[in-house]
């Protein structure tokens, strides 16, 4: 690969990741804020907080949509621009990549149910419970993708012998030395950003 191609590949990946991290970070903490607003409205019988939760939920859909588009673009870029890394990742660290996808779908399904069931429950409390899987899915999505990132910073769980991957241990790759601090940092900053 020539140096110009590497440079432009880095720039394109950096640009896409810059947009994605903004929306993804907001998307981790906002479900908790919506839940707090709806809970406050329910507990105090205050329609203003219920309306606030409803409007935040609609805005949250936009952040999720932009996150989906940029996340999909990142997946394509990793496959097309960095195939050697993806060959290694596919054999060693694919488990958290798949788990991140599952966590996202978990979040998206319950977000859809939450949005389309306003005023269909006899109690706001029951409706608010739908936000729990949304918040869990958003947080777990961040955890799993951060595990992949921590692997990139402290790779372990495999041996390279004569250019071949051997002794692959996906769980060891997931729980690498960088994982605890990176996951804690990402979750804390995502909640604080929101």
Which role does the model predict for each range below?
Residues 1-194:
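Polytopic transmembrane helical bundles with strong interfacial aromatic enrichment
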């Amino acid at each position: 690969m020539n140096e110009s191609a590497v440079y432009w590949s880095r720039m394109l990946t950096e640009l896409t990741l810059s947009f994605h991290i903004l929306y993804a970070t907001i998307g981790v903490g906002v479900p908790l804020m919506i839940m707090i607003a709806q809970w406050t409205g329910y507990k105090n019988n205050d329609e203003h907080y219920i309306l606030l939760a409803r409007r935040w939920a609609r805005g949250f859909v936009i952040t999720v949509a932009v996150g989906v588009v940029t996340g999909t673009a990142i997946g394509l870029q990793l496959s097309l621009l960095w195939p050697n890394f993806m060959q290694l990742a596919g054999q060693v660290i694919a488990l958290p990549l798949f788990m991140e996808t599952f966590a996202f779908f978990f979040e998206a399904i319950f977000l859809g149910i939450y949005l389309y069931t306003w005023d269909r429950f006899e109690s706001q409390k029951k409706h608010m419970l739908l936000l729990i899987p949304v918040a869990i899915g958003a947080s777990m999505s961040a955890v799993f993708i951060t595990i992949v990132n921590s692997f990139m910073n402290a790779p372990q769980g495999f041996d390279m012998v004569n250019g071949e991957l051997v002794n692959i241990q996906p769980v060891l790759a997931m729980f690498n030395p960088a994982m605890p601090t990176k996951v804690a940092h990402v979750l804390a900053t995502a909640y604080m950003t929101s």
